[in-house]
Amino acid sequence: MRLKSLILGAACMAALASPAFAQSLTAITGGRVLTGTSVIENGVVVIQNGRVVSVGTGAAPAGARIIDARGKVVSPGFVAVDSGLGGSEISSVGGSDDLSNGANSISASFDVSYGLDPWSFTLPVARLGGITRAIIVPSHAGGGGGGHAHDDSDFAGVGDGGLQSPGLFAGQAAIIHLATGTDILVKPRVAMVAPFGEAGAGIAGGARGAQFTQFKETLAEVRLYARNRAAYDRAGLRDLSLSRADLEALIPVANGSMPLIVTVRRAADIQQ
């Protein structure tokens, strides 16, 4: 019963992300409110213009839409990170998976936001669990495959088909909300994603050292391209290993304006 109350309370919070509530004044009253640092019995959570403006006790503001949460638990919405919600239905069915790309000329420039499905059956299921936002992370289409005990091929989306893309990068992540409606995208291209560890080593040729060398060389090429676009346009620049689309996508990473999400499993890889 307690689990049901928690789910119902979390679902209430998810509903508040809906555009219908975006410009309204709403109060959730009577519930057991978990703030993250304390527990408020018979609490009142006030939301105005889509944002929580107060959490406490007492009466709801005059004119507020009341959501009765008596007998329920109200908690902040959860954020799912490293998620495929809305981008993949069944991972084993290729036609339903828009999280990876095998084209040789598109790796860093791959943008998962174009493949998001607001009608995905995964969204309402996650919403019932209290998830209100998610970071949708692309998976790399290539990798070493492999079948030994420490294989990372299932991490960062590396498939069994072997190397499909020469790029070290899986693509660009996006943020979505899980409210009902057709526009679930909050922000596209929020971060670049790159698998490291054994998965990344397989992409680079089999060794971690090779991946780090290739990674540094790639960023050097991106900086060279960014300084010499005109020369690149007139074929006056040396051959570069990436397509123009990938070079453009990596400029924000090279200059520090876009975060880089690195996926690893081993402590030694994190320390690198």
Mark where each language-model region is.
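Bacterial N-terminal signal peptides that target proteins for export
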Residues: 1-8
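Polyanionic/metal-chelating signatures
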Residues: 127-272
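Histidine-rich, glycine-flanked metal-binding segment
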Residues: 33, 37-75, 92
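Soluble non-cytosolic domains of exported or imported proteins
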Residues: 100, 104, 113-120, 206-209, ...
